[in-house]
Regions:
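Two-component/phosphorelay signaling modules centered on CheY-like receiver
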Residues: 13-31
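Acidic, metal-coordinating helix/loop segments flanking the phosphotransfer/catalytic sites
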Residues: 32-50, 59
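C-terminal output helix
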Residues: 38, 92-93, 107-120
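Short amphipathic alpha-helix used as the core "switch/output" element in two-component signaling
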Residues: 60-79, 97
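The C-terminal output helix
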Residues: 121-135
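AAA+ ATPase active-site-proximal loops
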Residues: 135-146
Length: 146
C-alpha cells in the first residue's frame, strides 16, 4: 500500500464508489466528495496528497468548464497539490486546457484501472520529488535584539 490520501470529486455516486473501491487497496487514504463545493473545506480540514476531479457536475453540461474552474481554485490554495482530471467527454482541446491550467494528468472515463493507478503513482512520485528538490520554506522566527 502506497502512502498518500486521494480525494475523489465526482457527482456520479457509481463513479465515486468504483474509484473508492479501486483505490482503497492501493493508497493509505481515500476521501470522496459528490459536490465540488466541498473541495475547499476538505482540503482545509485534512491532508490530501492528490485530487481526482471530474470535469462536469451539472446535468447536460459537458464543456469541462466546471472542472477547470475548480482546478483553478485548487491551484490558488494549494499550487503543489496534483490534480488529475476525469471526464467522459474528453477531446484533445479540453485535455490541453486542463494541462495548461495545471492539471497533473487527464483521464477519460471509462478508465483502465492499471493505467489510472499508474498515473496517480506517477503524480505522487513527482510531487514527492519536487518537495525534495524545492522544500517548502517556512518563515523563520524573528531575531531578538538585546
Amino acid at each position: 500500500m502506497q502512502a498518500g490520501t486521494i480525494l475523489i470529486v465526482d457527482d456520479n455516486k457509481s463513479v465515486l464508489t468504483s474509484l473508492e473501491l479501486l483505490l482503497e487497496d492501493e493508497f493509505e487514504g481515500v476521501e470522496t466528495a459528490s459536490n465540488p463545493n466541498s473541495i475547499l473545506s476538505v482540503l482545509d480540514s485534512r491532508p490530501v496528497d492528490l485530487v481526482l476531479l471530474d470535469m462536469n457536475f451539472s446535468a447536460g453540461v459537458n464543456t469541462g468548464n466546471e472542472g477547470l474552474f475548480w482546478l483553478r481554485r485548487i491551484r490558488e490554495i494549494a499550487p503543489e497539490l496534483p490534480v488529475i482530471m476525469l471526464t467522459a467527454y474528453g477531446d484533445v482541446e479540453l485535455a490541453v486546457r486542463a494541462l495548461k491550467g495545471g492539471a497533473a494528468d487527464f483521464v477519460l472515463k471509462p478508465w483502465d484501472n492499471d493505467n489510472l493507478i499508474g498515473k496517480i503513482r506517477a503524480a505522487l512520485h513527482e510531487r514527492k520529488s519536487s518537495q525534495l528538490v524545492h522544500p517548502v520554506e517556512r518563515p523563520s522566527e524573528p531575531a531578538m535584539i538585546i
